[in-house]
């Protein structure tokens, strides 16, 4: 996570699917074909995605501002693993990497951008860190209509639209390779539980239902719809010319 975010519960890997084994196959299926061998991950959480990237043969620079999570990432890897952990927010990390003239062929940002107030600056920094032809891979919550108390409680500044992503890419000089919705079946449960009933937190039971029922079914439906219609999340693949 980066910048304006809530600590406490956000450090609990059981609450956020992208840091769990349940959600990892989804992320890998969405991004595998676009990954390079030199990856910068912004908001690496507990390191589950970084661990997968290393297994795929990538060199990983994992950025994580929360000390407890940064320690978890370091604990996952042996001294010989091709991983560097930067304990900083995205602004500090990008500045340090720029000072080293360090660039990447992939910048990965999963469920982080929605926590950042100045998302245009975030896009610009990511673009500057990419080599020509490099990819910026982003996964965020979609549909401002769904914005609710749970978004505020977990530090979400916004939920995204395709239009906003196109604007951000233009501003940063990036080309949109693909922009698709994900998780159409998650819309109704989210709307009922968090928007209408105004539940203030994510429970272990709801996480279990989400991981074991909604997420797998959504993945199947999304394969048919190919992210064209609507979904609870947005997935961006952008390219630096």
What label would you give each PLM region?
Residues 111-115:
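A short His-aromatic
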Residues 120-135:
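A short glycine-rich, Lys/Arg-flanked "PGG" loop and its adjoining helix->strand segment in the class I
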Residues 186-241:
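A C-terminal cap/extension of S-adenosyl-L-methionine-dependent methyltransferases
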Residues 94, 144-146, 185:
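Feature marks short, surface-exposed loop/turn motifs that line or immediately flank catalytic pockets
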Residues 136-158, 162-170:
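Short, glycine-/aromatic-enriched active-site segment of Class I SAM-dependent methyltransferases
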Residues 174-184:
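Conserved S-adenosyl-L-methionine
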Residues 1-102, 106-110, 123, 227-234:
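Conserved N-terminal segment of class I S-adenosyl-L-methionine
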């Amino acid at each position: 996570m980066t910048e304006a975010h809530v600590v406490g519960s956000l450090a609990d890997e059981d609450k956020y699917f992208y840091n769990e084994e349940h959600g990892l196959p989804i992320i890998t299926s969405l991004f595998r074909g676009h990954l390079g061998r030199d990856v910068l991950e912004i908001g690496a959480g507990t390191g589950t995605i970084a661990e997968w990237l290393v297994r795929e043969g990538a060199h990983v620079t994992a950025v994580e501002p929360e000390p407890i999570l940064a320690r978890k990432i370091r604990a996952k890897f042996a001294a010989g693993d091709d991983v560097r952990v930067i304990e900083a927010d995205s602004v500090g990390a990008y500045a340090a990497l720029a000072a080293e003239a360090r660039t990447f062929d992939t910048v990965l940002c999963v469920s982080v951008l929605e926590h950042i107030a100045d998302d245009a600056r975030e896009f610009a920094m990511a673009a500057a860190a990419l080599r020509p032809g490099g990819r910026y891979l982003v996964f965020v919550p979609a549909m401002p209509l769904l914005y609710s108390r749970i978004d505020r409680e977990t530090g979400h500044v916004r939920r995204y639209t395709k239009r906003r992503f196109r604007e951000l890419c233009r501003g940063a000089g990036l080309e949109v390779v693909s922009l698709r919705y994900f998780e159409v079946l998650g819309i109704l449960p989210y709307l009922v539980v968090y928007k209408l009933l105004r539940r203030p937190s994510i429970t272990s039971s709801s996480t279990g239902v989400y991981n074991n029922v909604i997420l797998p079914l959504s993945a199947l439906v999304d394969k048919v719809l190919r992210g064209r219609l609507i979904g609870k999340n947005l997935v961006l693949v952008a390219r630096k010319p």
